[in-house]
């Protein structure tokens, strides 16, 4: 280095003597000097990274902050790295608190990393407050907003599929659709939806939220966490906290993505020639005349005709800033999604704004607002594309019309393109949502906090539908043109408004006693909740002569024939008044106690004397790892044993006033001369003065543990829930009025497990996580012995004591009759006259005959097990995330190809039909007149198990040192693939099939769940 400096001195002296003034040469010299100076300042820094016990940390990361330059420690915890004095070194290790140190004049930098206390002291939102997760005795899953962002989902809940134990999420491929969520099974015959709480306000859905505006999401599943929500907590609670500013400089974030959606799993149907082969055989079996195929020689794939590759985009911008006294957040989003059926489109505009003001050291006020405008898609069905024959052409070019289907189909099925093209955009709908709160918070007497919050949510939905005149080409009619349906236009219209108003008044006391041995947080509160809905419906048809114009500006019920007008309305309101209390206590940080109480009064039961009900929970925990006898176990960081018990409530019933029934239309009477018709009315259902809430008794026991410097986390829990006093409607007998009573009990029980491993080896970081849930659902009692609730289009779903809710009911198939001798040797079938080739039903009750009494449970739609896997890998600026999920042990009932006297296209599996002795023992003969083959049986049951690569995301984050030159704080680009591949067993588009509480898991031609490919960019400045 001394020689280099001497050479530099001689060069300068030489230049001065020659007095060279050339600008280019001086520039070159300056560059040389700068380069030499930088070279002179670069040096090697060494050191050792250890833990608090002075043990070396192997594979700890040592990174030059703001760059991708770095190294890792060796087997002795030692490292060596080239740096400059201005550099800052960042030291990190999984489960440890990171440190940053400026190099300066140091040549040796030894670092001791401490255990990350945040791993043990994670704070979660629990409703009416927050708490350290280690102090809680229940099961709460925290989802960070980052896990929801950058995903092509209109509803943030869709992205949680497979990521949370105990939570089953069923997604639909329809544009803008909401997922179905069941937490720890189906708890009631009256509903399964959890309670959503958005910034403190109780809600029924969160489709108006932008995923980019969510800070965190907590999913509460256990009685210890849920009892404080009383009558609303029975089906679980999902708490959403939207983003607020953090103290620091003003930042602007822009996140935009775009991509496309594609149907990748089509239903396997026969082609044109195969259809003719099977249909000819069917006509022969039915002893019908052969069909004349003249003009019917197409080979149409109707699925290809109706489906499209759809466009999707999400765009968001947010501005955030904070000072010690004031913080604000403003986020605006725009989303647009096309459906995979042509002409379907959904769009949403959202706004999220919050302001918080710290007026004094003890007084804080603020507000939160969420708004949305949604234009729902005019969704179409895929059913006709599955049923229409492939021999029919799509379009007749000579007439310029779509083609009617052949005689054997057109009475039941339209050309699928009629709905897709000729009835496209005939429904116009707009949904508006405004939700928000204002609050004030006062700290006083050192340990007390009082918070008052007023919240309101207003939803306004309106829609109009137009029925056009549809003409098609039909060679079978004179003139070649026929009109579908009534041949008259029609309009219908609805308007619906819903209001929710809530007020909360909470007093919280927090203190520690006896040198921190006793730690207490106590909360008491008073809340009110009001909910009302008003809806008007109307319709008019075309009058004599005048056609209602095909113009959205004319689609109102003021147009059309007044004599054809129909109308209807719905209106109800409901209110709840509550007091609540909760205690979170620990002794010496290792003996935990949680207790909560809530007393609810509901207007729904105000005429019964049972309007008030108490709910409570008790929970205990033991942090064994804090005991002295556990301290020497170096690999154990945390071990907690926990258990809780509680009671919850449910008032969900589709009747607005279950205790005070409304009137409904009844028989009319004629009196007088001239005769006058007097309409009659009757009670919709009999009042029950003893009607009361549904009550859930729940308990769970489990453990949580962190091992190996908090790199490994594992938790497991056993849970059990009994819903008693089920609100059930008892049908009237022989035309009498039905009644409502508390007449049943449902039980759900199972096991939840979740495990995560995180580690970092130098520039490489990785994480692996998995979760698994088992569930057993059983109806313990219902009304009376032998009573069943029957649901579903094919009356295939039964709810009955001793069986799972919504189980599939029908005959078990023992094969296919191969011959008359086979029929004679089998139990006598009293249901119908059978022939060889018909389905052979099992004699379940063993009486020697096939009768309706042989029907039994043939499938359970509730999965026995659901599971999920996640893999994350980071290398320098690159990150890769893969989410997988699946379920098993459930069945699907296929209904879309099961109707008497209707001729549909054939599933590909029907090529293996019975057509002679020994040809098949699984597929019956082709004959729609043999109705026995259409009876509900396990011939229509399919395996609902599946495994799916749910999400794959690859991202690159640019070095801050590089992007700072263009004044950016952060820049990330990413690609995302959703629903990359599904391995399934059923014949339909998707094994994900939702439904109602008592009829789900039924494939009635369900909409496909597409693969979604997107590219995005996220930048902050």
Indicate where each model-derived feature is located.
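Conserved small-residue
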Residues: 253-297, 537-541, 741-744, 758-861
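Extracellular/periplasmic, surface-exposed regions of secreted and cell-surface proteins
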Residues: 148, 152, 174, 193, ...
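C-terminal extracellular loops and terminal segments
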Residues: 157-161, 740-747, 787-808, 853, ...
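Short, small/polar-rich motifs associated with maturation and membrane association
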Residues: 1-352, 357-372, 404, 435-436, ...
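Aromatic-residue-lined binding/catalytic grooves and analogous aromatic/hydrophobic interfacial grooves
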Residues: 202, 869, 1019
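Glycine-rich, aromatic-lined ligand/substrate-binding cores of catalytic
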Residues: 861-893
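Acidic, glycine-rich flexible loop segments
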Residues: 285-296, 312-314, 383-420
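Extracytoplasmic gating/loop element in the C-terminal half of outer-membrane beta-barrel translocons
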Residues: 290-291, 303, 472-475, 602, ...
């Amino acid at each position: 280095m001394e020689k280099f400096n001497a050479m530099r001195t001689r060069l300068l002296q030489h230049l001065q003597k020659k007095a060279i003034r050339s600008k280019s040469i001086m520039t070159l010299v300056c560059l040389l000097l700068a380069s030499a100076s930088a070279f002179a300042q670069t040096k090697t820094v060494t050191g050792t990274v250890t833990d608090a016990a002075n043990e070396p940390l192997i594979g700890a990361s040592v990174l030059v902050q703001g760059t991708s330059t770095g190294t890792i420690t060796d087997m002795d915890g030692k490292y060596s790295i080239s740096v400059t004095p201005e550099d800052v070194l960042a030291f990190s290790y999984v489960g440890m608190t990171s440190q940053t140190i400026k190099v300066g004049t140091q040549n040796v930098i030894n670092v001791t990393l401490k255990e990350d206390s945040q791993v043990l002291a994670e704070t979660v939102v629990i409703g009416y407050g927050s708490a350290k997760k280690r102090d809680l005795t229940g099961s709460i899953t925290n989802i960070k907003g980052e896990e929801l962002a950058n995903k092509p989902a209109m509803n943030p809940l869709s992205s949680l599929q497979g990521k949370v134990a105990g939570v089953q999420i069923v997604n639909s491929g329809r544009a803008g659709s909401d997922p179905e969520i069941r937490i720890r099974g189906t708890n009631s015959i009256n509903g399964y939806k959890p309670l959503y709480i958005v910034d403190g306000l109780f809600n029924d859905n969160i489709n108006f939220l932008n995923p980019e505006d969510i800070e965190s999401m907590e999913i509460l599943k256990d009685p210890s966490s849920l009892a404080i929500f009383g009558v609303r907590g029975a089906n679980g609670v999902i708490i959403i906290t939207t983003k607020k500013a953090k103290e620091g400089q003003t930042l602007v974030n822009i996140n935009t993505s775009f991509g496309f959606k594609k149907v990748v799993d089509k239903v396997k149907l026969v082609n044109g020639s195969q259809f003719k082969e099977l249909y000819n055989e069917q006509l022969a079996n039915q002893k019908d005349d052969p069909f004349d195929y003249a003009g019917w020689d197409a080979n149409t794939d109707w699925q290809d005709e109706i489906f499209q590759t759809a466009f999707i985009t999400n765009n968001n911008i947010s501005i955030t800033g904070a000072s010690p006294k004031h913080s604000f957040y403003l986020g605006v989003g725009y989303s647009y999604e096309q459906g995979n059926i042509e002409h379907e489109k959904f769009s949403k505009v959202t706004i999220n704004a919050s302001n918080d003001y710290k007026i004094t050291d003890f007084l804080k006020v603020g507000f939160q607002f969420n708004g949305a405008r949604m234009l729902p898609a005019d969704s179409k069905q895929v059913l006709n594309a599955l049923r229409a024959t492939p021999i029919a052409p799509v379009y007749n070019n000579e007439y310029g019309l779509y083609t009617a289907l052949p005689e054997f189909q057109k009475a039941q099925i339209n050309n699928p393109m009629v709905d897709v093209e000729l009835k496209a955009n005939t429904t116009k709908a707009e949904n508006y949502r405004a939700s928000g709160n204002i609050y004030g918070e006062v700290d006083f007497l050192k340990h007390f906090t009082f918070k008052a919050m007023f919240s309101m949510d207003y939803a306004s939905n309106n829609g109009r539908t137009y029925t056009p005149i549809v003409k098609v080409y039909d060679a079978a009619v004179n003139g070649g043109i026929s009109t579908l349906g009534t041949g008259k236009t029609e309009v219908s219209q609805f308007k619906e408004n819903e209001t929710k108003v809530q007020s909360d008044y909470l007093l919280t006391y927090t203190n520690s006693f006896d040198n921190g041995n006793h730690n207490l947080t106590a909360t008491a509160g008073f809340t009110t909740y009001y909910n009302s809905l008003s809806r008007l419906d109307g319709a008019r048809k075309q009058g004599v002569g005048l056609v209602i114009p095909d113009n959205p500006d004319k689609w109102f019920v003021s147009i059309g024939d007044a004599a054809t007008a129909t109308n209807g309305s719905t209106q109800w309101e409901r209110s709840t008044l509550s007091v609540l209390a909760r205690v979170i206590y620990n002794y010496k940080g290792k003996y935990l106690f949680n207790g909560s109480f809530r007393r609810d009064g509901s207007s729904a039961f105000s005429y019964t004397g049972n309007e008030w009900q108490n709910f409570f929970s008790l929970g205990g925990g033991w942090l064994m790892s804090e005991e002295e006898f556990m301290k020497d176990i170096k690999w154990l960081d945390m071990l907690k044993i926990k258990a809780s018990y509680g009671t919850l409530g449910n008032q969900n019933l589709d009747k607005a006033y279950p205790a005070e029934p409304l009137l409904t239309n009844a028989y009319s009477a004629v009196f007088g001369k001239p005769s006058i018709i007097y309409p009659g009315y009757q009670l919709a259902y009999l009042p029950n003065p003893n009607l009361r809430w549904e009550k859930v008794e729940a308990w769970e026991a489990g453990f949580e543990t962190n091992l190996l410097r908090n790199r490994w986390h594992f938790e497991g829990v056993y849970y059990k829930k009994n819903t008693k006093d089920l609100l059930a409607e008892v049908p009237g007998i022989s035309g009498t009025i039905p009644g409502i009573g508390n007449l049943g009990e449902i039980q759900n029980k199972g096991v939840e497990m979740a495990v995560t491993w995180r580690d970092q080896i130098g520039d490489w970081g990785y994480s692996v996580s998995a979760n698994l849930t088992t569930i057993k659902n059983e109806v313990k009692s219902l009304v009376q012995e032998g009573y069943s609730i029957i649901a579903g289009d094919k009356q295939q779903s039964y709810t009955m004591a001793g069986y799972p809710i919504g189980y599939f009911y029908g005959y078990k198939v023992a094969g296919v009759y191969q011959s008359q001798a086979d029929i004679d040797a089998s139990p006598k079938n009293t249901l119908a006259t059978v022939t060889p080739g018909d389905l052979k039903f099992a004699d379940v009750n063993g009486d020697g005959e096939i009768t309706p009494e042989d029907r039994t449970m043939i499938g359970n739609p509730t999965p026995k097990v659901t599971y999920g896997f996640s893999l994350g890998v980071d290398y320098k600026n690159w990150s890769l995330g893969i989410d997988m999920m699946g379920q098993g042990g459930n069945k699907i009932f296929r209904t879309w190809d099961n109707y008497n006297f209707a001729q549909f296209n054939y599933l590909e599996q029907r090529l293996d039909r019975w057509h002679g002795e020994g040809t098949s023992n699984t597929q019956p003969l082709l004959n729609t007149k043999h109705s026995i083959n259409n009876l509900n049986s396990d011939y229509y049951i399919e395996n609902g198990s599946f495994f799916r690569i749910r999400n794959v995301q690859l991202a690159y984050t640019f070095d801050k040192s590089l992007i700072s030159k263009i004044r950016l704080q952060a820049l990330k680009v990413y690609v995302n693939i959703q629903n990359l591949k599904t391995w399934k067993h059923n014949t339909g588009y998707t094994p994900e099939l939702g439904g109602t509480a008592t009829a789900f898991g039924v494939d009635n031609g369900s909409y496909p769940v597409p693969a979604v490919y997107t590219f995005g960019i996220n930048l902050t400045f």
